[in-house]
Amino acid sequence: MYKIIIDSCGELTDTLKKDGHFCNVALELDVDGYRIRDDESFDQHDFLRRVKESVKGPKSSCPSPEEYMQAFEGEADHVYVVTLSGKLSGSYNSAVLAVNLYNEEHEDSDKKIYVFNSRSASIGETLIGMKVQELEETGLSFDEVVKQTEEYIASMNTFFVLE
């Protein structure tokens, strides 16, 4: 059994949310001291209004190691984490720290956990998660899924258009 954890910068479709293999760990946004979780309760209109009225502009914070560790729990023996680019956020470092802490606390566990630095954002993270799912469904070993997914990430290019 496997689980794919994607930070909330990734775009999970309704189908992926219902799949059972995918879950999100939320980033947080701060607008003048008002904290907003980037989860299903996120109100984009309220957020944009607050940003427009803000003197300083918004800040974001990555999920804590504890939030990642909670997401590791469950029956899955293969856990894959896909994070926002390590050059854009601390999400990758937080997830790696969470793996180290989790492994210290669960020394006897057979659970295998790997963190992918997407080197991307948004749909790039989602595509990586979908690649992991495709590879897992073919019955590949954990190590082979990691290897092929890292090769996939190395071949990706992400482009953004700002309006």
Which residues are covered by each model-predicted region?
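N-terminal glycine-rich anion-binding loop in soluble enzyme alpha/beta folds
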Residues: K3-E67
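Conserved active-site and cofactor/substrate-binding residues in soluble primary-metabolism enzymes
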Residues: F42, D46, P63-E67, G90-N93, ...
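Acidic/polar active-site rim loop that often engages polyanionic ligands
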Residues: D108-K111, E125-E134
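Glycine-rich phosphate/diphosphate-binding loops that line cofactor/substrate pockets in enzymes
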Residues: M69-V79
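Short glycine-rich or small-residue beta-strand-to-loop segments that form or flank ligand, phosphate
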Residues: H78-G86, Y114-N117, K131
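Short, acidic/small-residue loops that bind anionic groups at enzyme active sites
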Residues: V99-S122, S141-F142, V146
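Short Gly/Thr/Asp-enriched flexible loops that form oxyanion-binding sites at enzyme active sites
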Residues: L84-H106, L127-G129
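Internal, active-site/partner-interface "lid" segment
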Residues: Q133-E163
